[in-house]
C-alpha cells in the first residue's frame, strides 16, 4: 500500500489498532477512537476490577499511525468517501475499516431505566469498557451486596472479580449451567464448585424479571450506610438507586450493586445508517469487505460466513488478514477456530484454569475420551468425529492444551487420544 492511500479505521480497540500497526508507516492511517483512555486490552478488565492489575497494565501497543482519542464517528458519507466526526472534523478515506466493536446487551428488565429511558439507576453497571470497570471499582467495598446477571464468560469473570474485592456476590444465570457455550455439564459443575468456594452464590435456571429501586437520599444527608459506594459515587439528586433484583418466581435478591453481563451485540449503527448490508453484524466476504468495496469490517462488529465471533483471537486474526489484503496479499480469511481460556483466581494456590475449543457436546456417533481427577480437581475431555478432533474442554491443568489445539486447528487425525490428554501433550 502506498502512502497516497488514505485508510481510516473507526475503532481504537484490539482489532483497529492491530490493523493500523500491521499496515505500518507506509500507509496513511487515521484511527478514530471514541474512548478518551489510552487504548487498552478489554480482555484484562476483570483483572483490573479484581485489583490484580493496575489499569495501565492493560495498555495496548501505541500505534505508529495517528490515533485520535475521544473522537466519535457520527456518519459515513459513502458518496464523498468521508467520515464525519462529533467534533466537526471530516476524515476522507480511500479505504474505510469499521472496527466498531460491540455494546453490552441491556436486557428488557422492569425498572432498569430511569424515566428518560436512557440512564441506568445508580448502582446498575454494564461491564464492557474501562469506564464501566472504574465505576464498578469505585462502588465495591467489602460487604457490598452484588448481583451479577448472566452466567457466561463475562458474568463468571465479573463475579469472581467482585468476590476478590470482598463483595457478597450472587450470580443469576437463566440457563441450566454456567458458560453453556463453552463448557459441558461436568466442566460447568466443577466451575460452579470453584466459584462457590470463592464465595459466589449461584442461581441457575433463574429468570430475572426486574430491578427494584428507591429514591436517592437528599445530597445534604451526611451518612452513608456501611458497604456503600465510594465517596463521590453517590446518585445525583432525583436519580433512583438500585436496591435489589426481582426474579420471575417472585423471589427478591437484595443488592447494592447490579452488574449486567448478558452478552454483547455488534455495533452496527454506523454501517446500517450508511446503507451497508447487515444481519447479526456487518456482512463481510473472505477479504473482510462489506457490500461497499471501499469499506471493510473486522472484529466484534463483523459477520463472516454467518458467524460473529466476539472474541479477541478472532479480532486479531481478522486484522492480520485484512492487513495482508490491503498490502497486496491474496490469502482469504476462512474463519477463526476460537479457543477460550480463563483463569479464576482464588486464595493462595486456589486458582482454576480452564480452556475450551470447538464442539464440547458430542453428537451421536462421536467418540469421547474423558480424564477426571477429583483429588487434583482436573477434568479433560475431547470429542472426536470420525478421525478428527472436533472439540475439547480442560479444567485445572492446561499443560496439554497447546498440543490439543494444534491437532484441532490442523485437522490432524489423533493417533492416541489418551496420550494426547496426558501431561506430555502427546509428544
Predicted regions and their residues:
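C-terminal catalytic lobe of FAD-dependent flavoproteins
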Residues: 251-275, 350-427
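Rossmann-like NAD(P)H-binding beta-loop-alpha module
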Residues: 135-183
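A Rossmann-like FAD-binding core segment of flavoenzymes
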Residues: 67-84, 91, 165-284
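Beta1-alpha1 glycine-rich phosphate/pyrophosphate-binding loop at the start
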Residues: 2-67, 161-182
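FAD-site-proximal beta/loop scaffold in flavoenzymes
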Residues: 119-141, 219, 231, 235-246, ...
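FAD-binding core/adjacent interface of flavoenzyme oxidoreductases
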Residues: 2-7, 60-145, 219-230, 246-248, ...
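Glycine-rich Rossmann-fold phosphate-binding loop(s) that bind the pyrophosphate
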Residues: 11-14, 128, 149-153
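Mid-to-C-terminal Rossmann-like scaffold of FAD/NAD(P)H-dependent oxidoreductases
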Residues: 3, 12, 301-398
